[in-house]
Amino acid sequence: MDSDPIVIVSAVRTPIGAMLGALSGLEATDLGAVVIKAAVERAGIAPDQVQEVLMGCVLPAGQGQAPARQATLKAGLPPSTGATTLNKVCGSGMKAVMLAHDLIRAGSQDVVVAGGMESMSNAPYLVPKGRTGYRYGHGTLLDHMAYDGLEDAYSKMPNGGGKSMGLFAEDCANKYHFTREAQDAYALESSRRARTANEDGSFAWETVPVTIPGRKGDVVVERDESPFKVDPSKIPHLRPAFVKDGTVTAATSSSISDGAAALVLMRQSEARKRGLTPVATLVAHATFSREPEWFTVAPVGAIEKVLAKAGWQTASVDLYEINEAFAVVTMAAMKEHGIPHDKVNIHGGAVALGHPIGASGARVLVTLLGALKKTGGRRGVASLCIGGGEATAIAVEMA
């Protein structure tokens, strides 16, 4: 093991807002600023001690130049702080953490903030032929959220977009013979866990309240929105969302959401020099890639790779966070690795909480750290699937 490993000294996320919900009045850069500021404060360092900020963002259209730079300056960090925006679809926030680790390990930087941010509610529509002009007939609008975030780029449909990610979730369900009933049961449990975690204080360590300015006074958002919009009794009766006789529904798919998450990383020696107590050590990270149409099972490979890098066995890991882009994604990883559900997403996952795509990779890592801290667990693995056939994973060990 590295004698001077990279450690995480703080981790924070916003509550997750529903589509056009509580957080929709803020841009992604506003949400990013909230978590960058909170992560620096919770780390116990001065803003001018951060050398670089890496933030994932999948839907940057309409936000202006360099969203990560905007978020950095809005957070009160000085103009001397470098900032980079990353796009690896749903893995953007986690890849930011992985690259922060590597920057520090290479000696390029000493203190880095890494995470992700997304306001899916504010993703604009695009006019593809607007620059050259529409000479005659009907024009076309493309939904930036769908086209650049939620549709497969390798299988174009007649409407100009790509195949919906949900169609590939149906393929995954068929491959593993996951029934509608099994997926519904998974979603119901995820919803129960997420609601309970919001109510019993399980998320208190990891979340930062978001203040929304308004003419009638500020509104403070302190808990995840979507778990309290769900009527569990309706889940078994929902229509299939993607295929007429399919098994995947809106309840077993992650919801369109807004949110952000960030972590502060440095070497262990740097933390000691500053008198800081790390939250955890980043033991290993991995990327796994395969055919685009099978992104749903890519976390299986990413988890296998990160466990091998860490020198761990599946059973030696106390908790897992495996992003629920669809229930079948997490179910497949659990089945392939023989992981019991009581070790996975113990506070609920994205089918209940929501999936702000640029932020989710960092969000699952922050939530993993919070869950390990609450339960007294030591080892954890966070992973998520990525459109295009990829997945990432990070292994951490609590300090």
Question: Each predicted region: which residue ranges?
Answer:
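Active-site-proximal alpha-helical scaffold in enzymes
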Residues: L86-E118, A173-S202, A262-S269, M334-K335, ...
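Flexible glycine-/small-residue-enriched beta->alpha junction loops
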Residues: V111-D171
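Conserved active-site "lid/cap" helical segment
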Residues: M1-Q63, P67-A75, P79-G82, F168-R180, ...
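Condensing-enzyme catalytic core mediating Claisen C-C bond formation in acyl metabolism
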Residues: M1-L26, A38, P232-V297, G301, ...
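Active-site pocket-lining segment
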Residues: F168-E170, V208, P213-G214, V283-A352
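Active-site nucleophile and cofactor-binding loops and adjacent substrate-binding regions
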Residues: G64, A83-S92, T252-I256, L282, ...
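N-terminal extracellular/periplasmic Venus flytrap/periplasmic-binding protein-like
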Residues: V12-T14, G25-V34, R42, A182-S269, ...
